[in-house]
Amino acid sequence: MEAQQDFTKHPEVAQDRLVLYVRKAIPAPTANSLKPLMILEALEIPYSIHLISSLSQETWYHEINPYKQLPALEDIDLVETSGGSKRRLNVFDSSAMLIYLCDKHDKDGLFIGRNATERAQVTSWLIAYAAGLGATGEWWLKMRHDENLKPALRVIENAIRREYDILEKRLGEPGQRWIALADRPTVADFAIQPLANPRVARNAAIDFEAWPRTKAWSEAVDRLAYIDRAKRLNNKLGMTEEEIELHGR
């Protein structure tokens, strides 16, 4: 008889590289899992992926993210606990992961800012996104679109429109090709674009053409080779070849 898995014990994972904890990309891939994948691919950081099948059953994971949400990561660096023992560093919240990975690996500040002025711009847009478009866009994708929810969905739709208006105004400033910095993409672009694109707009019954600068920017982000790699991976996380074919991924 096959031994049952002990969901209270941390499973064996790679010890020589960062481990990213995510869920399977069915029924749909998530924007939050995509964000750390973007910076991992952009900075070519070695990593492995571990799939979480049940957030409620796999109680060992609650030590990695006390909010019991995905994604999260464990790095190879050790931290000391209050009891004096050592454990791997855990980072949760996708925006926190973007900042952490840049602090550790982006030595030139390409994606997080080369000085305090640039960093302030990047983190301002990143954190504002988490409170604005990140929250409203995620709720739109999660809620069932039935008649009883129409008033709530209308509120979320209007909030998404306001967020797109802000992006459109920002991109209308002279020389502003990207969201935070004018000359190059940053983690602010990585965080925002998964919820500012034609697919999300279409799901919210919003015509993305109404924000032409935002649409052009979103397409420019998609053309970045490392973003394309991250999205392809995110779309197929944990899926078999049969599932990939069935879902057209």
UniProtKB/Swiss-Prot annotation:
Coiled coil: none annotated. One of its GO terms (molecular function) is glutathione transferase activity. Keywords: Transferase. It catalyses: RX + glutathione = an S-substituted glutathione + a halide anion + H(+). The keyword Nucleotide-binding does not apply. SUPFAM superfamilies: GST C-terminal domain-like, Thioredoxin-like. It is an enzyme of class 2 (transferase). Glutathione S-transferase; part of the gene cluster that mediates the biosynthesis of an unusual class of epipolythiodioxopiperazines (ETPs) lacking the reactive thiol group important for toxicity. Firstly, L-tyrosine is prenylated by tcpD, before undergoing condensation with L-glycine in a reaction catalyzed by the NRPS tcpP leading to the diketopiperazine (DKP) backbone. Afterwards the alpha-carbon of tyrosine is oxidized by the cytochrome P450 tcpC to form a hydroxyl group. This is Glutathione S-transferase tcpG. The gene is tcpG.
